[in-house]
Amino acid sequence: MNATRVSQLKNQRQSLRAGRGRKHPRWQFLRGFIKHPVMVGSIIPSSKILIEKMLKPVDWQNTKLFVEYGPGVGTFTRPILEKMAPDAKLIAIDTNQDFIDYLADDIDDDRFIAVHGSAADVEAIIRDHGFDHADYILSGLPFSTLPPGVGDAIAAATGRAIRDGGAFLVYQFSPKVRDFIAPHFEKIDRGFEWINVPPATLFWAYRQRQH
């Protein structure tokens, strides 16, 4: 067997080992749900129809910083990157190190930043990356099942972190999230998407500060 053939076989074996080592995103999502059920909204990733409906109001041309809470395995992350401008940034924040490691390894995009941390610290996180405010923040975190005080802290920090005219995009399986976000946003639009498991309530909460 010549040296070229030996090298090809070696590369094939290495590729197969790498493939076996990489977890399928659905398995990774299920694993994250089992380890942190309070922090993951659903055992099944969001549908494509829900994703498009949730992101439809975004003004992508004027978006420089988009932040995502609880990205999981990137169900929303990838569509956001597809829609973003070349000079924009996406910061994904998750308390689950497994999800952050998976995304950092799986997504090769200079615009993407994966952060292991709490959404309650969003103001410090965006400052650490050179921004004063976010244009949009997206969340699928289950506010109604978060530990006491955490949901309120996240909602308040989010209200302060979003620029005037920006919005907090929230998809939930309980409408109670409105109680958390209403004190911090001047306008809230609401929708619903049946084609998702489970069906989800959607909120678009806008910052319209008085000058």
Describe every region a protein language model picked out.
Residues 193-211:
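Core SAM-dependent methyltransferase catalytic element
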Residues 100-128:
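S-adenosyl-L-methionine
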Residues 63-72:
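Conserved class I S-adenosyl-L-methionine
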Residues 164-172:
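Conserved beta-strand signature within the Rossmann-like core of class I S-adenosyl-L-methionine
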Residues 89-94:
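Conserved SAM-binding motif I beta-strand of class I
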Residues 152-164:
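A short glycine-rich, Lys/Arg-flanked "PGG" loop and its adjoining helix->strand segment in the class I
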Residues 28-61:
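Class I SAM-dependent methyltransferase Rossmann-like catalytic core
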Residues 73-85:
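Conserved SAM-binding loop of SAM-dependent methyltransferases across substrates and taxa
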